[in-house]
UniProtKB/Swiss-Prot annotation:
Belongs to the EPSP synthase family. This is 3-phosphoshikimate 1-carboxyvinyltransferase. One of its GO terms (cellular component) is cytoplasm. Phosphoenolpyruvate binds at residues 22, 96, 124, 172, 345, 387, 412. It catalyses: 3-phosphoshikimate + phosphoenolpyruvate = 5-O-(1-carboxyvinyl)-3-phosphoshikimate + phosphate. The active site is at 314 (proton acceptor).
Length: 426
C-alpha cells in the first residue's frame, strides 16, 4: 500500500492556479461533440474522469486533438447524434460525470451501447435517469442489478414529451436529461419530483448549453421546457474554469494557517456554485477577498458553523476537516448525497475524523464535528476517493501531522495535488 506522510506545517503562503473543473470539462466535451463546428477547449482538466470521457468519444468515432499537456482539446463536432454500426462497450471507470451524460446522449442516435465501470460504479444509482429516458421512449436494460450500471442501450432516438425525474439524489441525472433534450424528436417538458439537490450544478449545465446556443426555460427549478429543433453550435473557443471544489482545500489552508493563499481560475464571475465555499469560510471567521477570477484566504481564528450545505456538497467535505481547527461544534446538514458519491462519504468522513480524536455525530443526512483539544496523528484511509485524500491533507496543520493511505487516488481530479499543497509550505 502506498502511503504519504505529511509532516506538520506551520505556515502557508502562495498562489495556486487551479486545474480545470471536472464538471465543466466533461459537460463541455460532450456538448462540443454534439455541436456543429470545431470547439477549442482550454484549461481542460487532465485527470482520470476526463480520460474516460475522451476514450469513449474516440471509440465512438469523434475526432479531437489534445495539446499542451492534455489541457487544450480541439473537438470536431458531429452536428447531431452519436451512432454506431456495431455494438460498442464503453468502460467509464468510476466517472459519474461521464456515465450519466453518455447514458442519456447515446439514446439519441442509432446503435447498441453497453456502459460498464469499476465495482464502485455498480453501486452508484442511475435508475432515476434511466426511468426518465424510458418515459421518452428509450430502450435501456440493466445487466446486473436494477437501477445500477452496467447497462445496455438499444438506441432509436428520443421521442420528446412530458417527463418526470427525481431531483433529490443527484443533479447529474437532470444535467444529463437537459443536455440531450434539445435533440429529441419533440419538445421536452421536465418536471422535478421532490426537492432538487445541488442546484448550482444545474446552473453550470444551463450556462454551458447557452454558450452552445441552446435555450432552456427554467421555471424556478420546478420544471424545465426545452424546444425541439434547436442545434448546438460551437462557440469556437471555451475556457474551462478552475475547479472550485479543488480550490476549497487551498482556501481552507489559507484560513487555517495563513499567511495568504490566492487561488486563480475561479472568482466572482465563476459559474460554479462551489465558490460559495469561500463564504462559509468567511462565516467561520476567515478573511476572504474576491476578484473576478481569483479568491484570497487569510488566516484568522475560526469558529464553528451550523449550515445547510446541500448547494455545495463536494466543497462541504472540506468544512468537515477544517472544523478540527474551529472553536465549537460544526454541523453540516442536508448532505445525504454524500452517500452515493465515490464512496459513502458520510460514513467514511465520520470514521476517519474519529481516528484523529474528533467527536462525530453521523446522521442520515448530516454530520457534526467537535474538534479534540489536540488532534492526534493517524493513518487515514481514502476509500479510492480523491476528495477524502485532499480533505485530510488539512491535518498537516495540526502539530502531529498525518499519513494518507493510497494518496494516488487524487488522480481522479487533481493528479499533482500533494505537490501543489506542499509548495504552499515552502
Amino acid at each position: 500500500m502506498n502511503q504519504l506522510r505529511l509532516e506538520p506545517i506551520e505556515k502557508v503562503n502562495g498562489t495556486i492556479n487551479i486545474p480545470g473543473s471536472k464538471s465543466i470539462s466533461n459537460r463541455a466535451l460532450l456538448l462540443a461533440t454534439l455541436a456543429e463546428g470545431t470547439t477549442t477547449l482550454t484549461n481542460l482538466l487532465d485527470s482520470d474522469d476526463i480520460r474516460y470521457m475522451l476514450a469513449s468519444l474516440k471509440q465512438l468515432g469523434v475526432n479531437y486533438r489534445l495539446t499542451n499537456n492534455n489541457t487544450v482539446c480541439e473537438v470536431d463536432g458531429i452536428a447531431g447524434v452519436l451512432n454506431a454500426d456495431t455494438a460498442q462497450t464503453l468502460f467509464l471507470g468510476n466517472a459519474g460525470t461521464a456515465m450519466r451524460p453518455l447514458c442519456a446522449a447515446l439514446t439519441l442516435g442509432q446503435g447498441e451501447f453497453t456502459l460498464t465501470g469499476e465495482p464502485r460504479m455498480e453501486e452508484r444509482p442511475i435508475g432515476d435517469l434511466v426511468d426518465s429516458l424510458r418515459q421518452l421512449g428509450a430502450d435501456v436494460s440493466y445487466l446486473k442489478n436494477d437501477g445500477f450500471p452496467p447497462l445496455t442501450i438499444n438506441a432509436t432516438g428520443l421521442s420528446g414529451g412530458d417527463v418526470e425525474i427525481a431531483g433529490d439524489l443527484s443533479s447529474q441525472f437532470l444535467t444529463a436529461l437537459l443536455m440531450v433534450a434539445p435533440l429529441a424528436k419533440g419538445d421536452v417538458n421536465i418536471k422535478i419530483k421532490g426537492e432538487l439537490v445541488s442546484k448550482p450544478y444545474i446552473d453550470i449545465t444551463l450556462a454551458l448549453m447557452a454558450q452552445f446556443g441552446v435555450n432552456v426555460t427554467n421555471n424556478n427549478y420546478v420544471s424545465f421546457e426545452i424546444k425541439t429543433g434547436q442545434r448546438y453550435i460551437s462557440p469556437g473557443k471555451l475556457l474551462v474554469e478552475g475547479d472550485a471544489s479543488s480550490a476549497s482545500y487551498f482556501l481552507a489552508a489559507g484560513a487555517i494557517k495563513g499567511g495568504e493563499v490566492k487561488v486563480t481560475g475561479v472568482g466572482k464571475l465563476s459559474i460554479q456554485g462551489d465558490v460559495k465555499f469561500a463564504d462559509v469560510l468567511a462565516q467561520m471567521g476567515a478573511d476572504i477577498e474576491w476578484g473576478d477570477d481569483y479568491i484570497i484566504a487569510r488566516g484568522s481564528k475560526l469558529n464553528a458553523v451550523d449550515l445547510d450545505m446541500n448547494h455545495i456538497p463536494d466543497a462541504a467535505m472540506t468544512i468537515a476537516t477544517a472544523a478540527l481547527f474551529a472553536t465549537g461544534t460544526t454541523h453540516i446538514r442536508n448532505i445525504y448525497n454524500w452517500r452515493i458519491k465515490e464512496t459513502d462519504r458520510l460514513a467514511a468522513m465520520a470514521t476517519e475524523l474519529r481516528k484523529v480524536g474528533a467527536i462525530v455525530d453521523e446522521g442520515h443526512d448530516y454530520i457534526s464535528v467537535t474538534p479534540p483539544v489536540k488532534p492526534h496523528t493517524a493513518n487515514i484511509d481514502t476509500y479510492n476517493d480523491h476528495r477524502m485524500a485532499m480533505c485530510f491533507s488539512m491535518l498537516a496543520f495540526a502539530d502531529c501531522g498525518i499519513t494518507i493511505n493510497e494518496p494516488e487516488c487524487t488522480s481522479k481530479t487533481f493528479p499533482d495535488y500533494f505537490t501543489q499543497f506542499n509548495a504552499l509550505a515552502n
